[in-house]
From Swiss-Prot:
UniProt keywords, alphabetically: Chloroplast, DNA-directed RNA polymerase, Magnesium, Metal-binding, Nucleotidyltransferase, Plastid, Transcription, Transferase, Zinc
UniProt organism field: Lepidium virginicum (Virginia pepperweed)
UniProt GO MF annotations: DNA binding; DNA-directed RNA polymerase activity; magnesium ion binding; zinc ion binding
GO cellular component: chloroplast; DNA-directed RNA polymerase complex; mitochondrion
Amino-acid positions noted as binding Mg(2+) in the UniProt annotation, renumbered to this chain: D489, D491, D493
InterPro entries documented for this protein: DNA-dir_RpoC_beta_prime, RNA_pol_asu, RNA_pol_N, RNA_pol_Rpb1_1, RNA_pol_Rpb1_3_sf, RNA_pol_Rpb1_clamp_domain, RNApol_RpoC1
Enzyme class: transferase
Name recorded for this polypeptide: DNA-directed RNA polymerase subunit beta'
Source species taxonomy: Eukaryota, Viridiplantae, Streptophyta, Embryophyta, Tracheophyta
Function: DNA-dependent RNA polymerase catalyzes the transcription of DNA into RNA using the four ribonucleoside triphosphates as substrates.
Family statement drawn from the similarity comment of this UniProt entry: Belongs to the RNA polymerase beta' chain family. RpoC1 subfamily.
Protein encoded by which gene: rpoC1
Catalytic reactions on record: RNA(n) + a ribonucleoside 5'-triphosphate = RNA(n+1) + diphosphate
Gene3D superfamilies: 1.10.40.90, 2.40.40.20, RNA polymerase II, clamp domain, RNA polymerase Rpb1, domain 3
Segment forming the signal sequence: none
One GO-annotated biological process of the protein: DNA-templated transcription
Length: 680
């Protein structure tokens, strides 16, 4: 059993037959070695107890009830007395029944069987390593080829003259005679290479380092040749080069992980613990069983039949043996991955069997449902909405979610401040939603970050930490700048919120996972906190006021909204006098008092460098005053000059939206400059 405190990661890969045997076999106190499942039975129909050496055997997988053997005897678990720790009659150990969740068994296959994941899935790892067409290998595995080229190094009978009684006849009539003789096994083991055993022998003879060297040499030669001018030949060269790259990467992976290629062919088939493939009794005495049990039974039936053909019957035709080996291969394929690149196997009710691959893969599989994405305490879920007023490292948490997530902390705070005498009184105060509850909740949230996660979590920025604040409503408020890391938008997306409990988790959330600590992409280093989607729309609306200058806006139809109560005809739009402001604070104050709109054009006094103004630009209008002063009005600015042509002041034509946008950028630059000065 894996200790979760000693192991920080889990790797799935190929293992050797010796490792499978070490996982599944155990030595009981009387010295007997158990672990091999030899019978396809589950429970006895009369006693309703597991069959010995069957798929639910208590000797192999442990007792069904803790401390009770198959005979019904009971022993206290962990008793230090000299009583035997197993039943001498049935051979069942007196251990905890939870052992049936992780104790494995194995099936000793009579013939080698290729692992269907490495043969039929694309790209085929076996075909890549052997550099042979997949169809040819499939025909060899499923015994569609009567014989293959001998791979033994010894001299073969097929190469010697006079080996056949009917030497005059052709090979077409001579070879089938060997498939019906009593010495077929000897002949086949020496002369014919077929089935998964042939694949295993070829994989065992591979030298991975030589494969890497030869593939690299061939890849360089193909690269030096250059284009041939024939499109078909050029495509073949490109495909061959891609294949060589995949082959080298695969060989390097096998070397790096200390995996032998022949392990892709199975000699021992692991049997899952019985608690992971249960049989449940429902109302009416009916039994519900996992499909994997039926698939295991099919494998054992066919494997035992093949064993009988090879051991008990000396005169079994060779074609029958090869056919039975093919059935064993197909049964194991169905167990591991039913219907892979073919018609799936169905039961009597025309229902597709759920294989091992179906159990572990997908959203409802073992990994994503119960290991990676299982439901946990101190977590919640809700729809996200935009929170533009939030800081980058903050998120808005609804009161309903926050009080549930931090309820234990609030209860502790109420008791510590002597506002509640016990847990029951504290819970009643929380249910009544007293004001003191929200005050304590805010105190708790100030020192406790939360984790936000949006599925699917494809990279590390899919889960980040934030400082929560209470908001009204039932939705989670999120700053729009962090959307790109989550790949989120505000069209109904949901996010999960988690509370880190341990000090290590809280420290990691604060130092590594805060959103303002993850401004760059960890993959390529580009900025990840960039305006996207709703923020871009907001910036567009904020700055879309004076794009066409004074000439186009003098009689702009957009000005009609300032005169909504007056009747305005399409041919004569009423002109709105544009107000003048001395500073940005007055302009924003007028907007807040609703005297002007967000995109209403206005004149703002500005300290503008004279060099920015083009000397050749001609004013659109010139307004003269009685004292001789005059205003030169350009497309986007206005200059007030004296009689002596001295510049008094300059006004720029802008909107409240532009002013707000400029102030935000200015504050951000100043804050960044201050932070840099502190660091230096």
């Amino acid at each position: 059993m894996i200790d979760r405190y000693k192991h920080q990661q889990l790797r799935i890969g190929l293992v050797s037959p010796q490792q499978i045997s070490a996982w599944a076999t155990k030595i009981i106190p009387n010295g007997e070695i158990v672990g091999e499942v030899t019978k396809p039975y589950t429970f006895h129909y009369k006693t309703n107890k597991p069959e010995k050496d069957g798929l639910f055997c208590e000797r192999i997988f442990g007792p069904i009830k803790s401390g009770i053997c198959a005979c019904g005897n009971y022993r206290v678990i962990g008793d230090e007395k000299e009583d035997p720790k197993f039943c001498e009659q049935c051979g069942v150990e007196f251990v905890d029944s939870r052992i049936r969740r992780y104790q494995m068994g194995y099936i000793k296959l009579t013939c080698p069987v290729t692992h269907v994941w490495y043969l039929k899935r694309l790209p085929s790892y076996i075909a890549n390593l052997l550099d042979k067409p997949l169809k040819e290998l499939e025909g060899l595995v499923y015994c569609d080829f009567s014989f293959a080229r001998p791979i033994t190094k010894k001299p073969t009978f097929l190469r010697l003259r006079g080996s056949f009684e009917y030497e005059i006849q052709s090979w077409k009539y001579s070879i089938p005679l060997f498939f019906t003789t009593q010495g077929f096994d000897i002949f086949r083991n020496r002369e014919i290479s077929t089935g998964a055993g042939a694949i295993r022998e070829q994989l065992a003879d591979l030298d991975l380092r030589i494969i890497i060297e030869n593939s690299l040499v061939e890849w360089k030669q193909l690269g030096e040749e250059g284009p041939t001018g024939n499109e078909w030949e050029d495509r073949k060269i490109v495909r061959r080069k891609d294949f060589l790259v995949r082959r080298m990467e695969l060989a390097k992976h096998f070397i790096r992980t200390n995996i032998e290629p022949e392990w892709m062919v199975l000699c021992l088939l692991p049997v899952l613990p019985p608690e992971l493939r249960p049989i449940i009794q429902i109302e009416g005495g009916k039994l519900m069983s996992s499909d994997i049990n039926e698939l295991y039974r099919r494998v054992i039936y066919r494997n035992n039949t093949l064993t009988d053909l090879l051991t008990t019957s000396r005169s079994t035709p060779g074609e029958l043996v090869m056919c039975q080996e093919k059935l064993v291969q197909e049964a194991v394929d169905t167990l591991l991955d039913n219907g892979i690149r073919g018609q799936p196997m169905r039961d009597g009710h025309n229902k597709v069997y759920k294989s091992f691959s179906d159990v572990i893969e997908g959203k409802e599989g073992r990994f994503r449902e119960t290991l990676l994405g299982k439901r946990v305490d101190y977590s919640g879920r809700s729809v996200i909405v935009v929170g533009p007023s939030l800081s980058l490292h903050r998120c808005g948490l609804p009161r309903e979610i926050a009080i549930e997530l931090f309820q234990t902390f609030v209860i502790r705070g109420l008791i510590r401040q002597h506002l509640a005498s016990n847990i029951g009184v504290a819970k009643s105060q929380i249910r009544e939603k007293k004001p003191i509850v929200w005050e304590i909740l805010q105190e708790v949230m100030q020192g406790h970050p939360v984790l936000l996660n949006r599925a699917p979590t494809l990279h590390r920025l899919g889960i980040q930490s934030f400082q929560p604040i209470l908001v009204e409503g039932r939705t989670i408020c999120l700053h729009p700048l962090v959307c790109k890391g989550f790949n989120a938008d505000f069209d109904g997306d949901q996010m999960a919120v988690h509370v880190p409990l341990s000090l290590e988790a809280q420290a990691e959330a604060r130092l590594l996972m805060f959103s303002h600590m993850n401004l760059l992409s960890p993959a390529i280093g580009d900025p990840i906190s960039v305006p996207t989607q709703d923020m871009l729309i907001g910036l567009y609306v904020l700055t879309s006021g004076t794009r066409r200058g004074i000439s186009a806006n003098r009689y702009n139809p957009c000005n009609r909204k300032n005169y909504q109560n007056e009747r305005i005809y399409e041919t004569h739009y009423k002109y709105t006098k544009e107000p003048f402001f001395c500073n940005s604070y007055d302009a924003i104050g007028a907007y807040r008092q609703k005297r002007i709109n967000l995109d209403s054009p206005l004149w703002l006094r500005w300290q503008l460098d004279q060099r920015v103004i083009a000397s050749r630009e001609v004013p659109i209008e010139v307004h003269y005053e009685s004292f001789g002063n005059y205003h030169e009005i350009y497309a986007h600015y206005l200059i007030v000059r004296s009689v002596k042509k001295e510049t008094f002041c300059i006004y720029i034509r802008t909107t409240v939206g532009h002013i707000s946008f400029y102030r935000e950028i200015e504050e951000a630059i100043q804050g960044f400059s201050q932070a840099c000065s502190y660091d230096t």
